[in-house]
UniProtKB/Swiss-Prot annotation:
It comes from Xylella fastidiosa (strain 9a5c). Catalyzes the decarboxylation of orotidine 5'-monophosphate (OMP) to uridine 5'-monophosphate (UMP). Coiled coil: none annotated. GO terms for biological process: 'de novo' pyrimidine nucleobase biosynthetic process; 'de novo' UMP biosynthetic process. Keywords: Decarboxylase, Lyase, Pyrimidine biosynthesis. Transmembrane segments: none annotated. It catalyses: orotidine 5'-phosphate + H(+) = UMP + CO2. Pathway: Pyrimidine metabolism; UMP biosynthesis via de novo pathway; UMP from orotate: step 2/2. Substrate binds at residues 20, 42, 70-79, 125, 186, 195, 215-216. The active site is at residue 72. Homodimer. This is Orotidine 5'-phosphate decarboxylase. Its EC number is 4.1.1.23.
Length: 244
């Protein structure tokens, strides 16, 4: 079942918190700490290794939170289709698949029997042109991102994961009705760490992002809930005030 239409998000659902923790106990602490400031959570590989991944997924759903399963599936089409078929039984809003192979994305969309929205990972925000060249791809990241976004669109995916630096180019290439979710968001007071292609909240939405993923800028804040609320305010301003 192709779910090509983008996920309809409320303004406060456009800030996705990266729940990168090693245990269910810590996950529950963060859910409680952030309260109503966060309505959408991304759960990834570190939590999967704890063996408590699906308990946390249920915990989030029970709290009325949206869930983003970020496991970046990349395998032969039949295997990825099987995983998506099983995940369709869970209350998942977003799920990621690597955007490197069109038949794999096609198989995933055909196996999706729920309202789960599939996002293609284009080029990780930790990667530069030099990193791509080492992999035999001697091209600018934006060119690779656009190529993979177009392939994802053709395969029936709901959208892509991409840096805010490439969001405007994706929107021009693919048009509306296709979700662009941007990680690598950084504020002035937070180091970039391993992120290379970063962007501010306001700039990401100005470039056409539908949602952003934020982890360390919230986790490292003196008051994480207040930091998240400040980001919610910035998002609301970016989406409601006319650009100059």
């Amino acid at each position: 079942m192709m779910n090509h239409t983008p996920l309809l998000l409320g303004i406060r659902e456009r800030l996705i918190f990266a729940l990168d923790v090693p245990s269910r106990t810590q996950a529950l602490e963060w859910i409680d700490r952030l309260g109503d400031a966060i309505s959408f959570y991304k759960i990834g590989m570190e939590l999967l290794a704890s063996g408590e991944y699906f308990q946390v997924l249920d915990d989030l759903a029970s709290c009325g939170k949206r869930v983003f399963v970020d496991l970046k599936f990349f395998d032969i089409p039949a295997t990825v289709a099987g995983v998506i078929r099983r995940l369709s039984q869970w209350p998942i809003s977003y799920c990621t698949i690597h955007g490197w192979h069109a038949p794999m994305m096609q198989a995933a969309t055909e196996a999706n029997t729920s309202n789960m929205h599939l996002l293609a990972v284009t080029v990780l925000t930790s990667m530069t042109r030099a990193d791509l060249a080492k992999m035999g791809i001697d091209r600018e990241p934006v060119d690779v991102v656009i190529e993979r976004a177009l392939a994802a669109h053709m395969a029936g995916m709901s959208g892509v994961i991409a840096s805010g630096q490439e969001a405007a180019a994706i929107r021009r290439a693919v048009g509306s009705g296709f979700s662009i979710v941007c990680p690598g968001i950084r504020t002035n007071h937070v180091p970039h760490n391993d992120q290379q292609r970063t962007m501010s909240i306001t700039a990401a939405f100005a470039n056409g992002a539908d949602a952003i993923v934020v982890g360390r800028p919230i986790r490292m804040a003196e008051d994480p809930q207040a930091a998240a609320e400040a980001m919610q305010t910035e998002i609301m301003t970016a989406l409601t005030e006319p650009s100059t």
